[in-house]
UniProtKB/Swiss-Prot annotation:
Involved in cell cycle progression and surviving DNA damage. Disruption phenotype: Increases frequency of mitochondrial genome loss. Signal peptide: none annotated. The chain crosses the membrane at residues 6-26. It is found in: Vacuole membrane. It is a single-pass membrane protein. The keyword Transmembrane applies. This is Altered inheritance of mitochondria protein 20.
């Protein structure tokens, strides 16, 4: 009996033990394979995440570059639009140096308008006579010239046709003498020319 039980136990136990051992071997191999696959999957996932991050960064960078390029283009267009206006204002407001000098020289050469109102009315002091058609200014030492006022053509014609005496003509001429512009005293021969003109009007 003992031998039979040993034989049955060995006949049954040995195959079972072998099967268990084989199963353990396959299980260990599968576990190693699973670990390798997990490591590989982790590496693949890491690579995918890196690629996604790089692509997202590249897209964001491209968007920033496009926006900056658009802003620079808009600024350039705005500057180009403003340049003609600035050039027009500069051309309108700028005056060359030779033009300014020419305007200044023309201003100096242009005669000033003489005022018809006298600041100091020339008078004749008592006891002082008219000296060759000159009258003294009370505030200054120089003399103002006296000149004839414009005659009417009718008075000239009547004076030329009438045969009055020299004393009557002199009286009429002295009554028509009035004070002329004080700035004409620069012409020293003004009175002489006036007297020659008066003498030429007298009938011979």
């Amino acid at each position: 009996m003992g031998n039979v039980s040993v034989a049955v136990g060995t006949a049954v136990g040995i195959p079972i033990a072998v099967g268990v051992i084989i199963a353990l071997i396959f299980w260990c191999k599968l576990q190693r394979r699973y670990k390798k696959e997990e490591i590989r999957d982790a590496d693949l996932e890491k690579m995918v995440m890196e690629e996604v991050a790089v692509s997202v960064y590249d897209g964001f960078k491209a968007e920033i570059n496009s926006s900056s390029e658009a802003s620079t283009i808009n600024e350039k267009e705005a500057n180009q639009d403003l340049k003609p206006c600035q050039e027009k204002t500069a051309k309108a407001g700028y005056t060359p140096a030779y033009r300014r000098q020419l305007n200044a020289s023309m201003g100096t050469l242009r005669p000033k308008k003489q005022s018809t109102a006298y600041t100091n009315v020339p008078v004749i002091f008592s006891g002082e006579k008219v000296n060759y058609g000159m009258v003294r200014d009370p505030s200054y030492s120089f003399m103002y010239p006296l000149t004839l006022s414009r005659k009417e053509t009718s008075s000239l014609r009547s004076a030329s046709t009438s045969n009055l005496s020299s004393s009557t003509e002199n009286t009429a001429l002295h009554e028509e003498i009035k004070l002329d512009d004080p700035y004409e005293n620069d012409f020293t021969n003004y009175t002489v020319n006036k007297r020659e003109f008066i003498d030429s009007l007298r009938p011979h």
